[in-house]
Amino acid sequence: MPFNQDSASSIRNFKVVGSRPVRPDGVDKVTGRAKYGADLSAPGMLIGRVLRSPHAHARIKNIDTSKALAAPGVKAVATAADFGSVRRSLRDVLENCLAQDKALYEGHAVAGIAAVDVEAADAALTLIEVDYEILPHVTDVEAAMAEDAPLLRPDMITSGIHPAPTKPSNIANYLELGHGDVAKGFEAADIVVERSFKTEATHQGYIEPHACLASFAQDGSADLWCCTQGHFVVRDTCAQLCGMEVSSLRVTASEIGGGFGGKTTVFIEPVALMLSKKSGRPVKIVMDRADVFKATGPTSSTAMKVRIGVTKDGRITAGAAELCYQGGAFPGAPVEFGAMSAFACYQLENLHVSGYDVIVNRPRQAAYRAPGAPMSTFAVESVVDEIADKLGMDRIDFRLKNASRSGSQSAYGPKFGTIGLVETLEAAKAHSHYSAPLEPGQGRGVACGFWFNFGGQTSVSLNIQMDGTIGLSLGTPDIGGSRASMCLMAAEELGIPYDRVRAIIADTASLGYNDTSEGSRVTFSAGM
């Protein structure tokens, strides 16, 4: 069916939704009044700094903080020894915040210090004496999978393989997805193209570095202000790491200067809380740019193999991929998402994807714009382009011939509902840009991509004020204009002007639990 622009027109005529009003945070941001993490302050505040390992892999034999603690202006020092035992699922989080037995990557935090000013804190950092035993390191995902690779965790056995291996390795997890008979599918192909790809880790590059302010009270309760994509997750994580009741910790999200998935976890927040607890004063920590790049999570680097078979008329008979993703020094690379996304745009009867979650001496990876999907999609789409060119087919026509649609079988089990891929491809081909002549130095590319959407837990409070305005309390930090979206929807449903709705991001003590702002979920979930 050819694309019909009229079919994409609104089913319902909206009065407010679809307009372009001034964002609730717009004026404050462009005039400099908005408060970001680094703008926060408190009476009696101390400055926190973090000592980081200069080695990619080293055993920590001893940490001597006595000289630093005796230095002028120093009020507290914190190491991993200050934190108690935590449940298994949080051990890696704590170890990433402060190294325990080993430094697992260059930039791994080893100790934190709180002093009366920046100069005193920086001077005291140089007085912390760490006795390192330097160990062999590995940073490349394929090198880490080799038989003779230096092991980050000598007791780690790969999960997902049956029967389980008897020897440890740097492969944390293995998975397989797919359906059909791949061998038979490749036998039926007239052309088979197999290619290998490597992608490097890419940092989110948010403009604002991580920043927080922690303040412990004498009764054991605490306040924490930080730039984050999910302050409820920060509350739950920090409370458990610091041995607190969740209700004793209130977290407030500051304005956020970019996140892109990289601010969905904790790095300096537990350290600031511990320093505040030990010193009895508020403690503020702001990462510098070197800290951000060395110690916070980029995407995974990868090594991938993709194989696709097609008939002469352009029908894909089989697809296969091997995906090796490194998750930094801790398990958790998003290889499963990569495997689920790789061939999602194509209707394949025969499909097999294998994935390896590999640890290396790098910072722990963090989410970045559809974590895991762009890498595997890049590999598959590159092969798809090559096949289309070999067949002499238009690249969109080849994709249309094989595109997933309602009822197509996904690699991970369910069948797709209405996804609109065919309509999108038809619209792209019908657009004048696709057939416009190219000037020297110009090119034109085509690719398909896939990502999930999920609801998650969300709580919103709506109150009618005495003056007739509407107060909206949201629990999802605004990283993409969600305050404006919520105001638009509230105004639409209540039949009032947009400027009569006021939205705030509430703290964790003022609203029910909210999941993080990620995965394109907030407008969908909070708007319901």
Q: What does each of the following model-derived ranges do?
A:
Residues 1-528:
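Structural alpha/beta core scaffold segments of enzyme domains
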